[in-house]
């Protein structure tokens, strides 16, 4: 019971609600954790409290903790491990805590898919799957689906008298392809798999269309649409009532009042009918008759008021007319005929989906593979059993898990789907009032509905649970935000109190949902939130809508670039919490958030033009990259050289290097036949003298092509790719171009993709090319390879979805004027979890099609869900900001938009009217009307408070609201007047005019001599490695060293060498592993393999480097005395960079300059450990020792000491200077032979 829970300790930093979430027990608990409320810390503390509970401790492996991502699971484990280690410091003798640390790696702290995998691995014998199954990648899954579906449709086309199938084809395919039918089958398959019982859900789709013996009132679609009818009639009535108020003004058109009152009565009649039945509304709609307005002399009244009255009345009439046309132009029974007619066709469609699912599952089973939805359904199959009445009950295995888990904790619960919810239900106790399920999330941040997440699960429990937990589950609100300044939180609250409600938005943004200040910040300057609305330029855009979008992106990018540059240049300050002080803002403190990434390239370009470093992880553009495009054409030619366009592209590319004239010459040798045939014929003959160079180029390429084609038939695709890179030299070539590193990274990604493809059950170049073509046909793409680290000092551009869980000092939210993406609502067919299937009624014989009731209902439902999702996306965007929030949107006609937005000022309630919120087409349609009711918009509007209540008008938030003229952003910067004369002289190539008083200064500069000429022959900045080389006699001079750095002519690139990695590359790989190996985990082969695989995924290692790592040598180090000291040390620092000033004569043996000269030395220390008696420095070496020295290690030791003595002495000196502590020991560790060398002075 509540009174038995531990009291919050004195001086605790936990809030009361946080503490309640940490200690509450005895029932299912739902924690609604607002953005920045410290939910992860609460979750970890709850787990720790359970583990170290004195009265009833729980082993960590008796907890199931479900996270949304693998990264979150790992972070959770790390935090729990750190917390347990702190407990161990206070209780060093606690065997229980030591046991928990050893159990932590085996604990069930993972994603739901990892838990499902664990269950399946344990009980695979209950399923018809190979226990050696593997997880299919997306590539393989798509290819399998395509193959299965092609086979099924081919069979159906071959069946005689397959009448219903061909009717389905006639209705839902074009005369060119059956792609739409394929899309329908795949979409139904995917949607069905988001339900615990897919077949049951599919059967319900068909049942809904069986309307025999039913009336329209029995249909769920009609019931839902009646609610929408009431909503629209209410909107119309509000327009009329507002018009009536205006007509009653002293200068209003009073003669209109009588007509308006009749309008209210008419709408009241329609609303009453809507509360009765569909048939009643239909009949009432047939009798709608609007009275004619009485003529008035407009000069007798305020003309603007008359226009407003007439406009509002027309809006009301339009609402009714829309209902009449969409819903009530047809008799109710005609809608029923649509359903009856479509029923057999839908039945056939569902049958095809079931056959597809069965065949697809069988093919995966034969190939020993499963996908992620299989993991969920297989797990559910193990944990459930079906009763006689068809209900799903927990199986014996589920009951075992219920007994095992003392508590199940689910993070990001708002993103759970129906199948995952069922799995969780089967491993937790039945009763919510006595349950052991702890759920944490924020439904306001549920933004993954497109991945079939179901926020309704969270909302249902939030409404059902109480804060006291009486008679059911308990809910706890964590509303305090420890991330952001007051200005960010108050600004966000002000907007969402007005736009987010249950009817429109699915969530009541009430006092419990509001963000509350939890963080403390010093006073800051210019911290008010901002809305910058850009008025688009009036110039005609020649490229239509696409051109207008580009211009909007450019305008917003220029405005953001100006603001970022101004803030950085002016030293705008942000708070550094680590140092508890203000500091100048850096580029990495800025983020630009977008709903989607199409604008990102334009924004990047504009920022770069302003000299602002910027990075965006683009998910497009990979196949458009020139180097990738050329290589894909090479592979197309290898697969089939008879393709003219790919072959011409390769011949024209830098690989072969033909000019346009040479290409034309080749074509002239044979006007008929393919390019390949012409090339073959040309090479058989003797070339003319002027064609010898062309002949040589083509002969070189032709011979290579024949070799590649032969190689492709016998060897792997990935080996073919490296062979092409090597024999063409193209990989090296692109490395020398601008952005060479990026280009080479793109080519490496192509190789990696090929390796991943070959890891599937598919093989061969043809299938690989076909798959890539399917990707391009679908409009998909991959992002270019990442060539930038996450800690770089750059402005980041990312989607709002990618930003979830992150925070930034300064946040720009751009593109707020872009329309919501409603393409899904325009599809030929619609699917919904509750309403099933909806499409137009299509009659191919009569060649007619029209909207059906199911389509209208699903479209309306999806529109309202889209509106709710977009609200949540906006909430996520606004809550990423820590200190400064800047909102930017562009509109075509600011005055027109403002007139629309000003309607909100007439409403006195906090929540804006439903029709304003539901009618929004972009984020600005919510933000601007909200802010126009605040006093800070008065500088722009100059309208006064009017009828806006004080609590809204004077709400405690600070905003800057501004309309920016787009012309000022696109105007070129004015050239300074004093530069005009200079520019004119440069244009005409005349002598530059020089003022007489500056002639002497110019002369002095030209004749000046450097006073430290001796220092010019030695570099002022050296690495420790370079200094070490200077001390080796054979390389004592800089000139010799520089000579050594020069690359020999025609150096063979690595991918051409048979021997694989160089010694230096192997050493780099080993150092990377030693830097990242997790010292908190047991050092075993399995753990190291897992960590190395993770480094490959993060692009910290390549596949080749990973394969070269000798794991047993890494383990040998940690088994050595020195390695054990590392594991037991008080602290361990790895890859420690340093810079220090050093007297020049200490670095250069041949120094002849001034004695006071210094140089800057830089280096990286491999490992530094702090023990009780001091600091030990360790440098890892991968030099070859064994077999290189006849006298063995004893002979090698003095040579190695001499070779590395200077290096380690400099490392030690750097550490002693920075730490103010002596280094007690300097060690070299050689992996070859497991040798340790101590360096003595």
UniProtKB/Swiss-Prot annotation:
Listed NCBIfam families: addA_Gpos
Cofactor or coenzyme needed: Mg(2+)
Pfam families in the record: PDDEXK_1, UvrD-helicase, UvrD_C
Keyword tags: ATP-binding, DNA damage, DNA repair, DNA-binding, Exonuclease, Helicase, Hydrolase, Isomerase, Nuclease, Nucleotide-binding
Subunit structure: Heterodimer of AddA and AddB/RexB.
UniProt xrefs under PROSITE patterns: UVRD_HELICASE_ATP_BIND, UVRD_HELICASE_CTER
GO molecular function: 3'-5' DNA helicase activity; 3'-5' exonuclease activity; ATP binding; ATP hydrolysis activity; double-stranded DNA binding
Family annotation (InterPro entries): AddA (IPR014152), DNA_helicase_UvrD-like_C (IPR014017), DNA_helicase_UvrD/REP (IPR000212), P-loop_NTPase (IPR027417), PDDEXK-like_dom_sf (IPR011604), PDDEXK_AddAB-type (IPR038726), Restrct_endonuc-II-like (IPR011335), UvrD-like_ATP-bd (IPR014016)
Organism phylogeny: Bacteria, Bacillati, Bacillota, Bacilli, Bacillales
Organism the protein comes from: Bacillus cereus (strain ATCC 14579 / DSM 31 / CCUG 7414 / JCM 2152 / NBRC 15305 / NCIMB 9373 / NCTC 2599 / NRRL B-3711)
Entry protein name: ATP-dependent helicase/nuclease subunit A
Binding residue positions for ATP: 33-40
Example of a GO biological process term: double-strand break repair via homologous recombination
Enzyme Commission identifier(s): 3.1.-.-, 5.6.2.4
Top-level taxonomic group: Bacteria
Role, per record: The heterodimer acts as both an ATP-dependent DNA helicase and an ATP-dependent, dual-direction single-stranded exonuclease. Recognizes the chi site generating a DNA molecule suitable for the initiation of homologous recombination. The AddA nuclease domain is required for chi fragment generation; this subunit has the helicase and 3' -> 5' nuclease activities.
């Amino acid at each position: 019971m509540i009174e038995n829970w531990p009291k919050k300790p004195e001086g605790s930093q936990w809030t009361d609600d946080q503490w309640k979430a940490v200690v509450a027990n005895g029932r299912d608990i739902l924690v609604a954790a607002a953005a920045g409320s410290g939910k992860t810390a609460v979750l970890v503390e709850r787990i720790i409290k359970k583990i170290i509970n004195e009265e009833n401790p729980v082993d960590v492996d008796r907890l199931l903790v479900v996270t949304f991502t693998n990264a979150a699971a790992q972070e959770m484990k790390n935090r729990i491990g750190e917390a347990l280690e702190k407990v161990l410091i206070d209780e060093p003798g606690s065997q229980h805590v030591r046991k928990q640390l050893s159990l932590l790696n085996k604990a069930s702290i993972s994603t739901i898919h990892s838990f499902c995998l664990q269950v399946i691995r344990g009980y695979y014998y209950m399923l018809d799957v190979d226990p050696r199954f593997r997880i299919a990648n997306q590539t393989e899954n798509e290819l399998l689906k395509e193959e299965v579906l092609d086979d099924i449709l081919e069979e159906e086309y071959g069946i005689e008298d397959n009448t219903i199938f061909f009717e389905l084809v006639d209705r839902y395919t074009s005369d060119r392809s059956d792609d739409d039918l394929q899309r329908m089958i795949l979409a139904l398959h995917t949607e069905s798999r988001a339900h615990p019982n897919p077949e049951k859900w599919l059967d319900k789709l068909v049942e809904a269309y069986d309307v025999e013996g039913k009336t329209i009132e029995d249909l769920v679609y009609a019931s839902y649409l009646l609610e929408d009818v009431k909503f629209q009639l209410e909107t119309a009535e509000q327009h009329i009532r507002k018009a009536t108020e205006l007509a009653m003004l002293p200068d209003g058109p009073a003669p209109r009042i009588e007509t308006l009152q009749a309008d209210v009565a008419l709408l009241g009649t329609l609303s009453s009918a809507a509360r009765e039945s569909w048939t009643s509304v239909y009949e009432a709609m047939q009798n709608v008759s609007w009275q004619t307005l009485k003529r008035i002399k407009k000069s007798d009244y305020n003309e603007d008021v008359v226009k407003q009255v007439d406009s509002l009345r027309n809006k009301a009439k339009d609402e009714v007319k829309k209902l009449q046309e969409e819903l009530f132009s047809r008799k109710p029974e005609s809608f029923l005929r649509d359903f009856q007619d479509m029923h057999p066709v839908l039945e056939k469609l569902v049958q095809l989906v079931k056959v597809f699912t069965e065949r697809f599952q069988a093919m995966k089973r034969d190939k020993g593979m499963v996908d992620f939805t299989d993991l969920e359904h297989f797990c559910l199959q193990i944990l459930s059993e079906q009763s006689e009445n068809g209900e799903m009950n927990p199986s014996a295995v589920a009951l075992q898990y219920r007994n095992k888990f003392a508590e199940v904790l689910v993070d990001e619960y708002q993103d759970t789907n129906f199948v995952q919810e069922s799995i969780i239900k089967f491993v937790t106790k039945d009763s919510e009032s006595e349950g052991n399920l702890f759920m944490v999330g924020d439904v306001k941040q549920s933004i993954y509905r497109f991945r079939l997440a179901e926020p309704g699960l969270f909302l249902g429990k939030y409404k059902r649970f109480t804060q006291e937990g009486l008679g059911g589950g308990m809910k706890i609100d964590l509303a305090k935000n420890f991330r952001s300044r007051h200005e960010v939180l108050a600004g966000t609250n002000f907007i969402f109190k007005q736009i987010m409600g249950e009817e429109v938005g699915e969530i009541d943004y009430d006092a419990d949902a509001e963000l509350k200040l939890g963080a403390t910040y010093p006073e800051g300057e210019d911290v008010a939130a901002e809305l910058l609305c850009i008025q688009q330029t009036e110039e005609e855009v020649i490229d239509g809508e696409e051109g207008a979008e580009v211009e909007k992106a450019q305008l917003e990018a220029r405005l953001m670039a100006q603001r970022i540059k101004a803030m950085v240049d002016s030293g705008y300050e942000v708070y550094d919490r680590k140092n508890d002080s203000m500091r100048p803002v850096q580029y990495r403190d800025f983020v630009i958030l977008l709903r989607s990434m199409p604008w990102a390239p334009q924004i990047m370009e504009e920022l770069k033009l302003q000299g602002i470093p910027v990075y965006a992880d683009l998910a497009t553009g990979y196949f458009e990259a020139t180097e990738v495009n050329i290589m894909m054409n090479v592979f197309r030619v290898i697969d089939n050289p008879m393709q003219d366009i790919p072959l011409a592209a390769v011949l024209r590319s830098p690989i072969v290097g033909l000019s346009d004239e040479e290409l034309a010459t080749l074509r002239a040798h044979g006007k008929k036949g393919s390019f390949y045939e012409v090339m073959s014929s040309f090479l058989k003959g003797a070339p003319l003298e002027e064609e010898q160079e062309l002949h040589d180029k083509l002969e070189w390429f032709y011979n290579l092509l024949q070799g590649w084609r032969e190689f492709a038939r016998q060897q792997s695709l990935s080996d073919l790719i490296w062979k092409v890179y090597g024999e063409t030299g193209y990989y090296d070539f692109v490395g020398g171009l601008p952005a060479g590193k990026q280009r080479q990274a793109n080519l490496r990604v192509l190789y990696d993709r090929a390796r991943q493809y070959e890891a599937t059950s598919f093989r061969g170049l043809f299938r690989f090319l076909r798959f890539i073509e399917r990707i391009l046909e679908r409009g998909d793409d991959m992002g270019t390879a990442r060539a930038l680290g996450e800690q770089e000092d750059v402005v980041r551009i990312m989607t709002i979805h990618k930003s979830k869980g992150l925070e930034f000092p300064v946040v720009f939210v751009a593109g707020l004027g872009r329309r919501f993406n409603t393409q899904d609502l325009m599809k030929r067919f619609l699917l919904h979890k509750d309403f099933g299937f909806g499409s137009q009624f299509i009659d191919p014989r009569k060649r007619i099609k029209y909207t059906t009731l199911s389509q209208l209902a699903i479209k309306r439902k999806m529109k309202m869900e889209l509106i709710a999702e977009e609200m949540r996306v906006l909430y996520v965007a606004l809550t990423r900001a820590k200190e400064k929030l800047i909102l930017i949107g562009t509109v075509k006609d600011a005055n027109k938009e403002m007139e629309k937005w000003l309607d909100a000022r007439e409403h006195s309630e906090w929540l804006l009217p439903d029709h304003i919120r539901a009618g929004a087409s972009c984020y600005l349609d919510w933000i601007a009307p909200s802010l126009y009711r605040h006093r800070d918009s008065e500088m722009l509007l100059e309208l006064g408070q009017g009828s806006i209540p004080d609590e809204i008008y004077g709400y405690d938030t600070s905003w800057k609201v501004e309309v920016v003229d787009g012309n000022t952003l696109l105007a070129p910067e004015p050239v300074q007047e004093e530069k005009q004369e200079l520019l004119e002289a440069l244009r005409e190539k005349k002598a530059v005019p020089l003022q007489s008083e500056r002639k002497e200064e110019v002369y002095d500069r030209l004749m000046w001599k450097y006073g430290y000429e001796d220092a010019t022959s030695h570099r002022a900045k050296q690495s420790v490695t370079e200094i070490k080389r200077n001390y080796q006699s054979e390389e004592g001079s800089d000139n010799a060293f520089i000579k050594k750095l020069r690359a020999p002519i025609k150096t063979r690139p690595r991918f051409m060498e048979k021997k694989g990695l160089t010694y230096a590359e192997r050493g780099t790989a080993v150092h990377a592993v030693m830097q990242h190996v997790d010292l908190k985990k047991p050092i075993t082969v399995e753990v190291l393999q897992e960590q190395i695989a993770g480094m490959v995924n993060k692009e910290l290692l390549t596949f080749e480097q990973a394969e070269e790592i000798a794991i047993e040598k890494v383990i040998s180090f940690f088994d050595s005395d020195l390695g054990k000291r590392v594991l037991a040390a008080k602290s361990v620092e790895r890859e420690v960079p340093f810079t220090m000033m050093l007297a020049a004569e200490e670095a250069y043996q041949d120094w002849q300059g001034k004695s006071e000269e210094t140089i800057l030395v830089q280096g990286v220390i491999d490992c530094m450990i702090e023990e009780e008696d001091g600091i030990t420095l360790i440098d890892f070496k991968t030099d070859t020792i064994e077999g290189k020295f006849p006298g063995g290690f004893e002979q090698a030791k003095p040579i190695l000491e001499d070779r590395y003595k200077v290096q380690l002495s400099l490392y030690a000196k750097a550490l002693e200077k920075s730490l103010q502590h002596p280094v007690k020991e300097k060690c070299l560790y050689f992996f070859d032979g497991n040798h340790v060398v101590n360096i003595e002075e």
